[in-house]
């Protein structure tokens, strides 16, 4: 797998797609999320569900995270140099990457090399990646101090949501699909309504 991964990186077989984020209030695109797909040399597409778990197991996910981050920073840098308006493009970061030595320094350097504002590349962490402990707390504080905005992805899919909300400085809350699936029944509506209210009271934006 590692040999195939190295070859794929060299040939830029990992393709970054941008999924738009819309504001319900303004009906405008307010940003995007970077998604990655593996387009093999022979043209076949490999879904993230197939390769991400393998890369997480082998530790290759750290290199893929940085690859995607570099691509997004490059996109934002090119738009700035072309005089175009930039909107934030969020990038997912795995738990393995958070624990990787010098991760923050490496990511800060990439942002600075591309001459872009930190706010243009928010970092998304899943509940699992952001499971609260002292080490995670310190690392996340360093990321915020460096200038990054943090989004909690898949909120409501795990068991540590409230602890993470209470202890970690997230800017945006992204509701998990499992919550949205119950929006048509009364209890589901109440859960979503109060979750949004809680997030707003903490000064956080909410995405679904």
Report residues per predicted region.
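Active-site core of bacterial EAL-family cyclic-dinucleotide phosphodiesterase domains
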Residues: 1-54, 92, 152, 208
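The cytosolic transmitter module of two-component sensor histidine kinases
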Residues: 1, 65, 103, 107, ...
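Conserved long alpha-helical elements within nucleotide-processing catalytic cores of c-di-GMP signaling
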Residues: 52-53, 62, 141, 189
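Nucleotide second-messenger and two-component phosphorelay signaling modules
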Residues: 7, 11, 23, 41, ...
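Catalytic core of bacterial c-di-GMP phosphodiesterases, primarily the EAL and HD-GYP domains
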Residues: 26-32, 60-136
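The catalytic core of metal-dependent phosphodiesterases that act on cyclic dinucleotides
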Residues: 110-183, 194-208
